[in-house]
Amino acid sequence: MEYKIFYSWQSDLPHRSNRSFIREAIDEAVSSISKDGVVEDSPRVDEGMDGVAGTPEVATIMFQKIDSSAIFIGDVSLVGSTEPFDENRVKKRTPNPNVLLEMGYAAARIGWNRIICVMNERFGERQEQPFDVRNRRFPINYRLEPGKDPNRDTVKTRLAGDIKGAIEVMALSEHQRVATIRTKLDSRCLNLMNQFASQPSFPSPNTSTAGQVLASIPIDAAIMRLLDLGVIRADVNTQIGLYAYHWTYLGDLVLRGLAMRK
């Protein structure tokens, strides 16, 4: 089964030591695990597009890519610092704000347990990370000079191994979660899952008539349980007043485990 990895990069630091280097390590890690992994870079707006009307579409594409990803990998190398508002406070270091935005969205949509943080400590230590990053997802670290570094290949091999290990731990955790979820599915959930397993999403039940309201009761109960279990997620189109439920990556694993989806 194909799984997608969303790579959130930044360009504040040299590509050779960060963006392209981390991408090479991710590709190496994925290829050593499976041929089914697909790595997608975060879309970024070119400098000449800043402020134009089409800019929001990049954010839409970015969020959609994160929603469909199994794993989020972000470069949280420290790129800047805050200016204290009085002399009694010290400067605080910070990663790229776009990476933090994407990571926060990923945490809400696919969960902290599927987020991998990576940082080049040549530009700052892990202990300098913002509190949430430091305590929730302590970053995988490496140290590489921005110019020609004789240890580049050695550092990349070690980083690829660390990323591979993190992905494998996530895979084991997902397998255990799928097994646990399967024990919590009642007949209403199984009927709904079997009905819509072949579709990427399904609509909220129609309740225009009294009969439809009664018929929707077991469906609504199944939907609530599947939402609680993280098997589906809800999206709403406010323009047409339509609710739709989409299978999550975890939901896809559950469907495959039940032989409802190939």
Predicted segments — roles?
Residues 234-237:
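Beta-hairpin "wing" of winged helix-turn-helix
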Residues 1-71, 183-184, 189-197, 201, ...:
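Conserved N-terminal substructure of TIR/SEFIR domains
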